[in-house]
Regions:
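Short beta-strand-plus-loop segments that form exposed binding edges in beta-rich domains
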Residues: 3-11
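Extracytoplasmic/secreted cell-surface and envelope-processing proteins
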Residues: 11-13, 301
Length: 344
């Protein structure tokens, strides 16, 4: 503090300075974080007191055969947890209020987030719990899902015709129980990718990408959760990404109800890259995008010469043979795909 005192003139003999320091305390309250930067401008008048600690689950994503109790917790005191089971994103006003352990007895895609007034909420955590005994006999359209896709009959169910089911399971002599057991084993034989999103992102008549498969570009990209589950049924990886329909003639639902899709990993959703060795130890362990091909030219939708004529492996075999001969070739693998808990 500096005091500057002046007398009347340089010849004046009287000079007195009697400063008084008066201070006022302004209670600014608790420190706050600003979620929106305002360089060169006043701070955002809002701000947050802190961040809600991430949600924790007592049971991780994966395969299950028996019912279990699922507990969800956050270390932040007096925080509220909300969850959904229909693929939608929980908010402070949307979703079930978590009050205690939840009984999980069937295939469930559960999304949860924690909230507290004045705090930044958690991100949305997604957990897919897949009961393969039920998946193996998956029924028709779930409640709220359309019975037709852009004028084409929707196809959600497993083909449970005993003869076809046995042959698809690997042996025409299988009993229904044996075919079901073999199907369950097959569902555990290769990696699983579970995609979870708002139902309307897929099936809204005007904006859903599955009902408007000709839509291209970022305007037809929808946010999704992506989970990778290993053959042993243990969850390996989860991130959020963008999802688009891809292909040319394969976009036609009259040709195939099983559309090709593409996952795009971007920072605006979650991880900027998929950081997981999806194609095995010899393949890359980082991906900007992944194509999920339905392989319509060599699958059940194009078995024009009869049931069982498709090989399913022709395209991938050709790529691997090309690569093994020292030539450039795209890498690929096989995986089971689920959309909002439904086997696809």
């Amino acid at each position: 503090l500096a005091i500057h005192g002046l007398n009347a003139s340089d010849t004046s003999g009287d000079f007195i300075v009697s400063p008084t320091h008066v201070w006022i305390k302004n209670d600014l309250g608790a420190a706050r974080y600003f979620t929106v930067p305002t360089p060169g401008a006043p701070n955002d008048p809002g701000g947050i007191v802190g961040f809600v600690a991430d949600t924790e689950f007592s049971v991780d994503r994966g395969f299950h055969s028996e019912p279990f109790e699922l507990a969800i917790a956050t270390a932040t005191e007096r925080a509220t947890i909300r969850y959904t089971t229909d693929g939608s994103e929980p908010t402070e006003s949307h979703g079930f209020l978590y009050t205690g352990p939840i009984t999980i007895s069937s295939t469930t895609v559960l999304r949860a987030a924690a909230f507290k007034e004045g705090f930044e909420p958690t991100n949305i955590d997604t957990q897919s719990y897949l009961f393969l005994d039920q998946v193996a006999v998956q029924a028709g359209a779930p409640q709220g899902y359309p019975s037709s896709w852009a004028g084409v009959s929707a196809d959600y169910a497993m083909d449970l015709n005993p003869t076809d089911y046995a042959r698809a399971a690997g042996d025409a002599s299988f009993s229904p129980a044996e075919a079901r057991a073999a199907t369950v084993d097959s569902l555990k034989s290769i990696p699983t990718i579970s995609i979870v999103t708002e139902r309307d992102n897929l099936f809204d008549p005007a904006t859903g990408i599955y009902l408007n498969p000709s839509g291209r570009g970022v305007q037809w990209e929808r946010p999704v959760s992506v989970e990778i589950i290993g053959e042993d049924g243990v969850g390996r990886y989860q991130t959020d990404a963008g999802l688009r329909i891809m292909g040319f003639t394969s976009r036609n639902l009259n040709t195939t109800p099983k559309l090709n899709m593409r996952l795009l990993f971007k920072k605006q959703y979650g991880d900027a890259k998929l950081d997981y060795p999806l194609l095995g130890p010899e393949g890359p362990d980082e991906f900007n995008t992944i194509a999920l091909r339905g392989n319509i030219r060599d699958a059940w939708v194009t078995e024009h010469s009869g049931f069982g004529s498709a090989l399913y492996i022709g395209d991938e075999w050709a790529k691997r043979a090309q690569f093994d001969m020292g030539q450039p070739a795209p890498r690929g693998t096989f995986a089971h795909i689920y959309l909002n808990g439904m086997y696809w």
